[in-house]
C-alpha cells in the first residue's frame, strides 16, 4: 500500500514544474533553506520542495538523465542566423524515459549567442514555442535556450554555477536538462536545455511594465550595439546597460522609448550613487545585500572575468516602493575557470592557474589581475560592515562549496557519460572530457583553499 501511495505522489510531482530541482541522491551537506526574498518579488512554492521524483531503484533521478530532442524545420530550412527576423518554423519532439516529460509541438528556432555563435561550428539555439509548455519538468513558458557548451570541455561550467545559485537562494535560477539534439536529420550532439533569462511568471517574476530587468553587457551596450534602442551608458560608473524588461513592445504602451530609457538610467543611477558613497545602511534600503554578496563571491570563486567587461551580468527590481535591486539571474560562465584567452577562437584550455583574481585581493583598490573591473562591483569593499558580511558569508558557505555544490554538478556528468562520448565523436576537440572534469574538480578544490586566504585577508574597510 505504501508503494502505491508513493508512486501516486511521484506521478503528481513529475508533472509539476520544478524550481528547487532537487535530485535523487542527498547532498553531503543539506541545502540551506531558501530565504524569503526581500525585494518584493514573488516565489513559486515549489522552490523549497525537496520531494524525490524517482524511485530509489533508478540510478539517476529524472533531472540528470539525457532526453532526445528532434527538431524539423518546415521545408528543411537551415538554421543559419541568430537574427530575430530569421526564426524558422519547426516541429519539436522530445523523448524522455520519464514518460510524462515527452513532448511534441510547434514552435520556431534561430541561432543565439555572441562569440559562441560567431566562432564555433557547434551552434547554440533559441527556441520559441507556439504555446507555453513545461519542458522536461521545468516551469511552463514559450522561450527556451539550447546551450552548445562547445568551448567548455567539461560541459559542466554553467551547470555548476546554476546549482550554486539555486542552492544559495539567488532568485530565479536557471536549471539544466540534458538533451541530444537532432536537427533536420543531423545529429548535433549534447546540449544543455535551460530557461531564457526574461521577465515572466515562471522566469524573472517582476512587473511586466513597471519592473526592471537589466544586463550589464558590452555586446548589447551602446558601444558594440550603437543602433539598438534599448541600451545606455550608466550615469555614475559608465557601464554598458541593456534593458531586457520592459521589452520594446511594452515600452510603446507605457511611455515613449526615450522617457523609459531615461527612467531606467535614473533608477540605476540612484543605486550607483549609493555604492559610490559605500554607505552600507543606505544600500540595504535599496538593494538585496545578501544576494549581492553571494553573487559576487560566486563570480570570484569561479574566476569569471566577464565581470570586468562586463558581460552577462543581470540585475532586476520589481515595482513598488519596497522593492529592492537584486543581482541575478546567474548566466554564462564558460569564460571563467581560468580560460586560456590566447586561444579564444579555437581553444578549450582551462584550469592552468587557480591563484588569479577578478575582483581582487583588495577589491576597493583594484589589486587584481583585472584592475579595470567596474568599481560598481568593488566600491562596497570600502565599507567595514560590508566586508565583515562578505567574510562571514564565505565562512558560512565554504563547507558546501566542495561537499555539496560540486558533487551535485558531477551527477549531471555521470548521468551523461554515453552522450558525452557521442558528442565528442561529433565535435572532436583536443581534450578528453573525463580528464577535464577531473582537472576541474582539482582546480575547484584548490581555488576554495585559495579563496579562504583571499577572503580572510580582505582589508577591513572604513
Language-model segments: what does each one mean?
Residues 168-180, 304:
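Short, well-structured beta-strand/strand-turn elements
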Residues 14-54, 462:
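Bacterial Sec-dependent N-terminal signal peptides
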Residues 124-128, 143-148, 155, 163, ...:
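Structural recognition of the beta-strand scaffold that forms the well-ordered cores
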Residues 105, 116, 120, 244-309, ...:
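Middle-to-C-terminal accessory/interaction subdomains
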Residues 1-15:
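Sec-dependent bacterial lipoprotein signal peptides
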Amino acid at each position: 500500500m505504501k508503494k502505491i501511495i508513493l508512486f501516486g505522489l511521484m506521478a503528481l510531482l513529475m508533472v509539476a514544474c520544478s524550481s528547487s530541482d532537487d535530485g535523487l541522491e542527498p547532498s553531503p551537506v543539506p541545502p540551506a533553506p531558501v530565504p524569503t526574498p526581500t525585494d518584493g518579488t514573488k516565489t513559486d512554492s515549489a522552490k523549497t520542495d525537496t520531494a524525490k521524483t524517482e524511485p530509489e531503484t533508478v540510478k539517476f533521478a529524472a533531472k540528470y538523465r539525457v532526453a532526445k530532442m528532434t527538431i524539423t524545420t518546415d521545408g528543411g530550412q537551415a538554421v543559419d542566423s541568430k537574427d530575430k527576423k530569421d526564426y524558422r518554423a519547426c516541429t519539436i519532439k522530445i523523448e524522455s524515459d520519464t514518460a510524462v516529460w515527452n513532448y511534441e509541438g510547434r514552435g520556431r528556432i534561430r541561432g543565439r549567442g555572441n562569440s559562441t555563435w560567431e566562432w564555433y561550428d557547434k551552434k547554440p539555439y533559441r527556441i520559441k514555442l507556439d504555446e507555453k509548455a513545461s519542458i522536461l519538468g521545468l516551469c511552463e513558458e514559450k522561450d527556451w535556450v539550447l546551450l552548445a557548451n562547445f568551448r567548455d570541455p567539461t560541459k559542466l561550467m554553467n551547470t555548476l554555477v546554476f546549482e550554486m545559485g539555486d542552492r544559495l537562494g539567488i532568485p530565479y535560477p536557471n536549471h539544466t536538462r540534458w538533451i541530444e539534439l537532432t536537427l533536420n536529420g543531423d545529429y548535433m550532439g549534447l546540449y544543455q536545455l535551460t530557461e531564457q533569462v526574461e521577465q515572466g511568471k515562471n522566469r524573472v517574476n517582476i512587473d511586466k511594465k513597471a519592473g526592471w530587468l537589466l544586463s550589464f553587457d558590452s555586446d548589447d551596450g551602446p558601444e558594440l550595439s550603437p543602433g539598438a534602442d534599448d541600451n545606455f551608458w550608466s550615469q555614475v560608473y559608465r557601464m554598458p546597460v541593456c534593458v531586457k524588461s520592459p521589452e520594446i513592445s511594452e515600452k510603446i504602451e507605457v511611455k515613449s522609448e526615450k522617457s523609459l530609457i531615461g527612467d531606467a538610467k535614473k533608477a540605476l543611477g540612484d543605486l550607483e550613487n549609493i555604492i559610490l558613497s559605500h554607505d552600507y545602511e543606505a544600500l540595504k534600503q535599496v538593494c538585496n545585500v545578501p544576494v549581492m554578496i553571494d553573487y559576487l563571491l560566486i563570480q570570484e570563486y569561479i574566476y569569471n572575468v566577464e565581470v570586468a567587461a562586463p558581460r552577462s551580468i543581470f540585475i532586476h527590481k520589481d515595482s513598488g516602493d519596497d522593492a529592492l535591486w537584486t543581482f541575478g539571474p546567474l548566466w554564462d560562465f564558460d569564460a571563467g575557470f581560468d580560460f586560456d584567452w590566447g586561444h579564444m577562437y579555437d581553444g578549450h584550455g582551462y584550469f592552468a592557474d587557480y591563484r588569479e583574481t577578478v575582483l581582487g585581493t583588495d577589491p576597493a583598490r583594484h589589486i587584481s589581475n583585472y584592475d579595470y573591473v567596474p568599481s560598481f562591483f568593488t566600491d562596497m569593499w570600502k565599507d567595514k560592515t560590508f566586508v565583515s558580511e562578505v567574510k562571514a558569508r564565505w565562512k558560512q558557505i565554504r563547507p558546501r562549496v566542495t561537499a555539496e555544490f560540486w558533487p551535485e554538478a558531477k551527477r549531471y556528468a555521470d548521468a551523461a557519460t554515453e552522450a558525452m562520448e557521442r558528442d565528442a565523436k561529433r565535435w572532436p576537440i583536443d581534450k578528453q572530457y573525463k580528464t577535464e572534469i577531473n582537472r576541474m574538480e582539482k582546480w575547484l578544490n584548490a581555488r576554495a583553499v585559495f579563496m579562504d586566504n583571499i577572503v580572510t585577508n580582505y582589508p577591513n574597510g572604513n
